[in-house]
Curated annotation (Swiss-Prot):
Phylloquinone binds at W671. One of its GO terms (molecular function) is magnesium ion binding. Gene3D superfamilies: Photosystem I PsaA/PsaB. P700 is a chlorophyll a/chlorophyll a' dimer, A0 is one or more chlorophyll a, A1 is one or both phylloquinones and FX is a shared 4Fe-4S iron-sulfur center. It comes from the Eukaryota. InterPro entries: PSI_PsaA/B, PSI_PsaA/B_CS, PSI_PsaA/B_sf, PSI_PsaB. This is Photosystem I P700 chlorophyll a apoprotein A2. It catalyses: reduced [plastocyanin] + hnu + oxidized [2Fe-2S]-[ferredoxin] = oxidized [plastocyanin] + reduced [2Fe-2S]-[ferredoxin]. [4Fe-4S] cluster binds at C559, C568. The keyword ATP-binding does not apply. The lineage of its organism: Eukaryota, Viridiplantae, Streptophyta, Embryophyta, Tracheophyta. Chlorophyll a B3 binds at M662, Y670. The gene is psaB.
Length: 734
């Protein structure tokens, strides 16, 4: 018999319709559902694919370094980071003739180029890279790592090198190795790089392999470490008039706790960063020796979980049974990993702009905006994925007998309470926030702005004051000069920190008012509603009041309206699908808020945000409409400009986004009819009918059409905002 796609499912391969192709693509990575799969082969396949993933990442980062070295302007950017625009790569084939060539020839380049808004120039500069040769060396090294990863992946698919199932199930050893080896050793190595290469580089000392062993990163070398005088490493830090990359104002300290920002680069002190990584390394190296493996010492996770019986018995059997439930469910583990990674990614977005670590990145406004938005969107997709795999866990892996009356079972037992509380919180936030916005809109429309309801965020202001912001006049903790909190750190990190918090030119603890109060609650509404949909989708995945157990229906069971027995109540796939819209919606509000707040800060007209953000028309008119003017003006009677490409992308993004609705607002029968009409016409058209297909064309399933619609909606939404964000920011600040 001929081999047809998909080879992993004989049932699908024999399907006579086009369903074979689409279902084949959809289940290609669902190894669990493949023919002849065993638990051991499942783990081995996933393990080997991780190497492929690493190879792709190394290749991609290698490409970044290579193209900047080849076509960029790294060496001239270093001479003047604030005024030279960093080049990502050349544009081979600029369409639209001479005007396009002129519009895109910038940054000192000979021909058309793309500008880098990723912050890689600032990062490479901070960590000690200085020449194009450095970049080429890095690119080649990463290419080598990529090749190594591919070989590793191939090797671990060979019979002799396939790890056994027991190896994959050995959670303690894996944790020890990942905590010590992955986090601990790599943090220690990074501290070493910062101390030996980056910090000398920031002081005008060029350290490479040829002089690595001759240049002492600290005048007394290891002396202070071996004699216990560790405080010496913090003495003589860089002065406040230090010029980054030169000896002027440079100190000799390597591990400090200065607090605040380097006055010239507006980024964290490199010696503070090294100190931070050393502390992280220390913690993780200890943490990686906590669990019991071959030596009979340390904690057994199973024993820990079994021993934790809640006092008084009011919380059931605590964590009994959880170890095996988690250790035997890849989906549970993936859900936990995605949830953690999602939170970390969002935290990265928040900290990259408020506590910038890379030299001069805080003054590259477009890069700041792009990085914040990028990391928030990534976080949103990762977090929704966590709940999707949580739902799949309940359907495929959850065993009620194994988890009787433990914390997991009790979550399911009182899911109605959880869901209804989330629902109540969402309703409260939604009605009150919208009510305030609409009231304020009406007041402005009728010319009585003084009748707006404006609420000062006093609790948030109090928290900012506790961290040392003096604007609001709260005399509390770090903003009180005679309290114990202030006195404890006054001679170490506090002067630097307090200067940073109270200087209004950076993004640390921005001054907040009624507009911030409202948009904060709008974002809270989005977060709670997204969470409600996702939590309900996971908790009801196996069954609900209407349908007690749907284990055999699988995950991608469609919600098909009340006529089909109320299946919407329990379709985990549909919950995920709805949640992604809410996730995108919420991140829209988050990024609008961040961007508008910062544009007014950077332009020095914060009153525009403060006055216009308290009503919806203000957001529509003074943020969206006002800032899209450059995009609408991308092509005009005077020819092209460097924003034209973003103007085109803005239009194209809207088009992709709108295409999504064609798939979202339609019935399956319509598609089937359309496809049969097209097939009929094709078969009766001369020349066209020379091309035949073997598979009978059938319409997409309900779930597939929703996926196609969702994909277009998401991609279009993000493209549109990306173009808006980059054009409106770079158009203002260059």
């Amino acid at each position: 018999m001929e081999l047809r796609f998909p080879r992993f499912s004989q049932g699908l391969a024999q399907d006579p319709t086009t369903r074979r192709i689409w279902f084949g693509i959809a289940t290609a990575h669902d190894f669990e559902s493949h023919d002849d799969i065993t638990e051991e082969r499942l783990y081995q396949n996933i393990f080997a694919s991780h190497f492929g993933q690493l190879a792709i990442i190394f290749l991609w980062t290698s490409g970044n370094l290579f193209h900047v070295a080849w076509q960029g302007n790294f060496e001239s950017w270093i001479q003047d980071p604030l005024h030279v625009r960093p080049i990502a790569h050349a544009i081979w084939d600029p369409h639209f003739g001479q005007p396009a060539v002129e519009a895109f020839t910038r940054g000192g380049a000979a021909g058309p180029v793309n500008i880098a808004y990723s912050g890689v120039y600032q990062w490479w500069y901070t960590i000690g890279l200085r020449t194009n040769e450095d970049l080429y060396t890095g690119a080649l090294f990463l290419l080598f790592l990529s090749t190594l990863s591919l070989i590793g992946g191939w090797l671990h698919l060979q019979p002799k090198w396939k790890p056994s199932l027991s190896w994959f199930k050995n959670a303690e050893s894996r944790l020890n190795h990942h905590l010590s080896g992955l986090f601990g050793v790599s943090s220690l190595a990074w501290t070493g790089h910062l101390v030996h290469v980056a910090i000398p580089g920031s002081r005008g000392e060029y350290v490479r392999w040829n002089n690595f062993l001759d240049v002492l990163p600290y005048p007394q070398g290891l002396g202070p470490l071996l004699t216990g005088q560790w405080n010496l490493y913090a003495q003589n830090p860089d002065s406040s008039n230090h010029l980054f990359g030169t000896t002027q104002g440079a100190g000799t300290a390597i591990l400090t706790l200065l607090g605040g920002f380097h006055p010239q680069t507006q980024s964290l002190w490199l010696t503070d960063i090294a100190h931070h990584h050393l502390a992280i390394a220390f913690i993780f190296l200890i943490a990686g020796h906590m669990y019991r493996t071959n030596f009979g010492i340390g904690h057994s996770i199973k024993d820990l979980l079994e021993a934790h019986t809640p006092p008084g018995g009011r919380l059931g059997r605590g964590h009994k049974g959880l170890y095996d439930t988690i250790n035997n469910s890849i989906h549970f583990q993936l859900g936990l990993a995605l949830a953690s990674l999602g939170v970390i990614t969002s935290l990265v977005a928040q900290h990259m702009y408020s506590l910038p670590a890379y030299a001069f990145i805080a003054q590259d406004f477009t890069t700041q905006a792009a990085l914040y938005t990028h990391h928030q969107y990534i976080a949103g997709f990762i977090m929704t994925g966590a709940f999707a795999h949580g739902a799949i866990f309940f359907i495929r892996d959850y065993n009620p007998e194994q988890n009787e009356d433990n914390v997991l079972a009790r979550m399911l037992d009182h899911k109605e309470a959880i869901i209804s509380h989330l629902s109540w919180a969402s309703l409260f936030l939604g009605f009150h926030t919208l009510g305030l916005y609409v009231h304020n809109d009406v007041m402005l429309a009728f010319g009585t702005p003084e009748k707006q309801i404006l609420i000062e965020p006093i609790f948030a202001q109090w928290i900012q004051s506790a961290h040392g912001k003096t604007t609001y006049g709260f005399d509390i903790l770090l903003s009180s000069t005679n309290g114990p909190a202030f006195n404890a750190g006054r001679n170490i990190w506090l002067p630097g920190w307090l200067n940073a918090v109270n200087e209004n030119s950076n993004s640390l603890f921005l001054t907040i008012g009624p507009g911030d109060f409202l948009v904060h609650h709008a974002i809270a509404l989005g977060l709670h509603t997204t969470t409600l949909i996702l939590v309900k989708g996971a908790l009801d995945a196996r069954g609900s009041k209407l349908m007690p157990d749907k284990k055999d229906f699988g995950y991608s069971f469609p919600c098909d309206g009340p006529g089909r027995g109320g299946t919407c109540d329990i379709s985990a796939w549909d919950a995920f699908y709805l949640a992604v819209f809410w996730m995108l919606n919420t991140i829209g509000w988050v990024t609008f808020y961040w961007h508008w707040k910062h544009i007014t800060l950077w332009q020095g007209n914060v009153s525009q945000f403060n006055e216009s953000s308290t009503y919806l028309m203000g957001w529509l008119r003074d943020y969206l409409w006002l800032n899209s003017s450059q995009l609408i003006n991308g092509y005009n009677p005077f020819g092209m400009n460097s924003l034209s490409v973003w103007a085109w992308m803005f239009l194209f993004g809207h088009l992709v986004w709108a295409t999504g609705f064609m798939f979202l607002i339609s019935w399956r029968g319509y598609w089937q009819e359309l496809i049969e009409t097209l097939a009929w016409a094709h078969e009766r058209t001369p020349l066209a009918n020379l091309i035949r297909w073997r598979d009978k064309p059938v319409a997409l399933s309900i779930v597939q059409a929703r996926l196609v619609g969702l994909a277009h909606f998401s991609v279009g939404y993000i493209f549109t905002y990306a173009a808006f964000l980059i054009a409106s920011t770079s158009g203002k600040f260059g």
